């Protein structure tokens, strides 16, 4: 359990993590929202923050401040040079992290939040200000879905993975397939929809000028064995 410092505590009975995120991202700041779900209900803690500096993974490791961001699949080749990196990508940075200048931890059990980074009075002033109104939800227009690799290529990779496992070359292989679909919906609309329909225990939303990441991550599982429910 986290101990709270009374000098940095903010009452959150009228404030949600998403509302705090909308306030902190004003002014063009790079921002992030980390949430979790436990047994179908919002988890105990949520984290909201923002910053004006974006750094790579190498810089994030040495900056000495809290960071939130991502590592692309291409980073695996740095950890294991024998791993091939797909040639076709999204022309995205291999890594990108927001250095948190303001960081707030919500405790939903206590109905309170604590300022972990930034001046408490400045952060409290932002959170107590008017909430920016998100764009009204609309009937989004979507195009056709493109999947990479194709179904045939993906199924062929599954067969190859099984061969490696049977041969003892590996005990776990994670295959992925990227789905792309053009849409008129905003990144925030997509995140709010994912929060409602996707049964995942981990949620995150991050954005900066020209960049948006929204995701819910499922738990990994394995084939059921015996009579134990999975």
Report each predicted region and the residues it spans.
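Extended alpha-helical targeting/anchoring segments
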Residues: 1-230
